[in-house]
UniProtKB/Swiss-Prot annotation:
The protein's name in its UniProt record: WD repeat-containing protein 91 homolog
GO cellular component: cytosol; early endosome membrane; endosome membrane; late endosome membrane
Gene3D superfamilies, per the entry: YVTN repeat-like/Quinoprotein amine dehydrogenase
Job of this protein: Functions as a negative regulator of the PI3 kinase/PI3K activity associated with endosomal membranes. By modifying the phosphatidylinositol 3-phosphate/PtdInsP3 content of endosomal membranes may regulate endosome fusion, recycling, sorting and early to late endosome transport.
Originating gene: wdr91
WD repeat placement: 462-501, 503-542, 547-591, 594-633, 636-675, 684-723, 726-766
Compositionally skewed regions (Polar residues) per UniProt: 269-304
Taxonomic source organism: Dictyostelium discoideum
Family the entry assigns: Belongs to the WD repeat WDR91 family.
Disulfide bonds: none
SMART domains the record matches: WD40 (SM00320)
Membrane topology: Peripheral membrane protein
Subcellular location, record wording: Early endosome membrane; Late endosome membrane
Endpoints of the signal sequence: none
Lineage of origin: Eukaryota, Amoebozoa, Evosea, Eumycetozoa, Dictyostelia
Length: 766
């Protein structure tokens, strides 16, 4: 029994008495506590008190203390054991024979007799110890006083009959009957026996319920700590097992597919040979064995590919020429894509019929476009583009594929500068030129406009398969990236090094940070959600979702920090279900009534009360989280919705569809988009969903494309204001960590790379 527990409980009792107004009771309680006979159940202090009574020859208080201990504690130990025995016999009387029961009772009776005998012997020895101490100190009068006071009681004990002569023996130390009691050995043995007995009694006495509550609370905390430690050990072992299973699976795939290209089978477009590389700062999205090449990749996460991007002026071209590797066909080239126009007010949907693009994925490509002006641009794969801004006729000769391109400048299209990654035409100072037609408005460039420029870019090549998702932690200190091989990597942005690899054993389709507790949620295509604590760098556990809907298509964390939503669909993508989960218990809270809708993308509003969803049937549905039912919905796209995102003002909503449309909506005037953005289209095959990412003040947003770049938009301008290039495959995921001081963009592609791009901001004061 811990004295600190008693003191803590005493303070609680005093606090309760004062709270109830029992001031007099509290006063007496304090007085009795000062005269505590038990000394807080501290054996040393009780023995010290016994020695004080003996040394002061206070036999009355000595006997009183012993009787108090006997009645209060010693007898209760006996009573408790008796009850335990009786209960045990009652519960087992149908199974024990009479012989066994009698044997158990005999054993108990013997133990009980031993306890009573021990108590009686210690009581007698304590009094003998008092008498011997008095004789050793020549206090014969105290000895006679003792026998006079307790003679009637002692005469009943045969062991004491010879002790009545002790005060009259001249030299009792040499008397054979009493010699042993005057030895130091007997005195020390008695003191040790008494100490051990009291310690055993105090450890086994039944505690009051009020004290048991506090002890149980402490015991529960101790057990919880043990459970946490065991869970941590279990997760470490599971992580090791997952890693070994992943390596085994990789080795099996490696042995069976040495001559196959995973990139060709997954992306559906022609890949150049490994030897055909540009001698520039980017790597081609090439074929080769994914698993073999992963062993050759460096462990270091990011490598600097450019220190500074200087914007340069460029000529106009159509959207098909925006890629820096035009000779290779792009995913989705077979369908029409909206061209990016500088003036969407006049030419949002106008496509010049004089411009044609013919692509052959098996042979070299020759593209001819008639132009009305004259300019010459010679492009070589080993050098940067040379642009003559005084002429208006461009002729591009590529030594790798022999592509010749003539571009018109009267179709309203603007070429994206691949060297500086700056959209539209710019002057010698790096600012965008004003529109030649002099139009002002949402798409015009006005004085004082914020301009983004790419300052630097780093590339990560540690993933061995196509990227599926990448996302910043809210404070920008960490990056999570996932790939189709089932691995998730956590990166420390400040140190630019790979920190942790999480093995999920199947393709990771969704990724989400819970920013308050720094948890990472990874949804896979085999009915699992892995939850990882980035602070402790350990797994919390796995959530098993419905086997009927194995693909966890999207995860969205509620801004209130209490829950998250998951959208799971079946393998045929014909049915799905949406659940909300309690983040603390990891149990389902609500099943949203989606009326059979298959949901690809989800987004909470800033208060966490509404959930917007983008569906396979092209509709946007908005759910009320409290009721779990849709409160609004409209047909937004003619094909699947791949991304839907709430703005922080809770009035605007952005959506991206497989139909190549990128819209801004007002949820109070549904049915007609507020703005349509010039967008080249997103990846069609294989199926991917994505996220639209905003800067800190929601004035700009970023989105990936089926080309080899991501596009940055001002929310009030239809045309993109910046292109984030460098990838050699479609950009399927991106995220933007923005603050008033810095802007960092991360993009992930089917080329297996992650690119970290730092932006600089300036204002156009022309």
């Amino acid at each position: 029994m811990n004295s600190s527990n008693l003191n803590y409980l005493d303070e609680l009792v005093k606090e309760y008495l004062i709270f109830r107004g029992f001031t007099q009771t509290n006063h007496y309680f304090s007085l009795e506590k000062k005269g505590d006979k038990l000394k807080g159940f501290q054996v040393d202090r009780i023995l010290e008190q016994i020695n004080i009574y003996i040394s002061s020859y206070d036999i009355n208080h000595l006997v009183e203390l012993w009787n108090f201990l006997d009645i209060t504690f010693f007898s209760k130990i006996d009573y408790n054991k008796s009850n335990a025995y009786n209960n045990n016999n009652n519960n087992n009387n149908n199974y024990n024979s009479n012989h066994n029961s009698n044997g158990s009772y005999t054993s108990y009776r013997n133990n009980n007799n031993d306890l009573q005998s021990t108590i009686k012997k210690l009581s007698s020895s304590l009094r003998k110890y008092y008498v011997i101490y008095a004789i050793n100190n020549n206090k014969i009068d105290k000895v006679k006083e003792f026998f006079d006071q307790y003679s009637l009681e002692l005469l009943k004990d045969p062991d004491w009959q010879s002790w009545f002569a002790l005060p009259y023996i001249r030299n009792p130390q040499s008397d054979p009957l009493f010699e042993i009691y005057f030895s130091k050995t007997w005195s020390e043995a008695f003191s040790l026996s008494l100490r051990n007995f009291l310690s055993t009694i105090f450890k086994n006495i039944p505690l009051p319920k009020i004290l048991q509550f506090n002890l149980e609370r402490q015991n529960r905390k101790r057990l919880e700590t043990q459970v946490e430690n065991l869970l941590s050990i279990n997760e470490e072992l599971r992580s090791q097992v997952d890693k070994l299973e992943y390596q085994n699976k990789r080795d099996q795939n490696n042995s069976g597919s040495n001559n196959n290209s995973n990139n060709n089978s997954n992306s559906g477009f022609t890949i150049g040979n490994v030897s055909q590389r540009k001698e520039s700062n980017v790597n081609n999205f090439n074929s080769g064995n994914d698993l073999n090449s992963s062993n050759e990749r460096e462990v270091n996460s990011f490598s600097r590919v450019s220190k500074r991007f200087e914007p340069r002026s460029t000529s106009s071209t159509n959207i098909a020429a925006m890629d820096d590797d035009d000779n290779k066909p792009m995913i989705g080239i077979g369908r029409s894509r909206k061209s990016i126009s500088t003036n969407s007010v006049n030419s949002n949907n106008n496509i010049n019929n004089n411009n044609t693009s013919n692509t052959n994925t098996n042979t070299n490509t020759n593209t001819n476009t008639n132009t009305n002006s004259n300019s010459n641009t010679n492009t070589n794969t080993n050098s940067n583009s040379n642009t003559n801004t005084s002429n208006n006729n461009s002729n591009s000769n590529n030594n790798n594929n022999g592509t010749n391109t003539n571009v018109t400048n009267n179709n309203g299209f603007q070429h994206l500068n691949l060297s500086g990654f700056e959209m539209t035409e710019i002057d010698e100072n790096g600012f965008k030129k004003k529109s030649s037609n002099g139009l002002n408005g949402s798409d015009g460039i006005e004085n004082g406009e914020l301009v983004y420029n790419i300052e630097s870019q780093e590339v990560c090549t540690s993933h061995s398969s196509a990227i599926t998702r990448c996302k910043f932690l809210s404070n920008g200190s960490k990056i999570a990236s996932s790939s189709i091989d089932g691995t998730v990597r956590l990166w420390n942005v400040g140190f630019s090094s790979r920190q942790t690899t999480i093995y999920c054993l199947s393709e990771v389709a969704s990724l989400e940070w819970e920013n308050r507790s720094k948890l990472l949620l990874c949804g896979t295509i085999d009915s699992k959600i892995k939850i990882w604590n980035s602070l402790t760098d350990k797994a919390i556990g796995d959530i098993n979702t419905s086997i009927e809907f194995p693909r966890v298509e999207d995860i969205a964390c509620n801004p209130n920090g209490n829950s998250f939503a998951t959208s799971s669909i079946n393998n045929g993508r014909t049915d799905g279900v949406v659940y909300t989960w309690n983040l603390r218990t990891l149990k389902t809270e609500e099943k949203l009534s989606s009326s059979g809708a298959v949901i690809n993308s989800m987004s909470f509003n800033s208060t966490g009360t509404l959930l917007s969803t983008g569906c396979v049937d092209g509709t946007i549905r908005i759910f009320d989280i409290k009721s779990g039912s849709p409160i609004a919905g409209w047909q937004a796209h003619s094909n699947e919705i791949l991304s839907v995102q709430f703005s922080s003002d809770e009035n605007r909503l952005y959506s991206l569809g497989k139909d190549g449309k990128l819209y801004q909506w007002n949820i109070h005037s549904m049915g007609k988009p507020v703005k349509e953005y010039d967008y080249p289209g997103f990846l069609v095959d294989p199926h991917r969903t994505t996220k639209i990412s905003f800067n800190h003040n929601q004035s700009s947003f970023l989105v990936g494309t089926n080309n080899k770049f991501a596009l940055l938009y001002n929310i009030d301008q239809s045309s993109p204001i910046l292109q984030i290039s460098g990838h050699t495959g479609p950009v399927v995921t991106c995220d933007w960590n923005s603050s008033s001081q810095s802007d960092v963009i991360i993009t992930g592609s089917l080329d297996k790379t992650i690119r970290l791009t730092k932006l600089s901001k300036s204002f156009n004061n022309l």
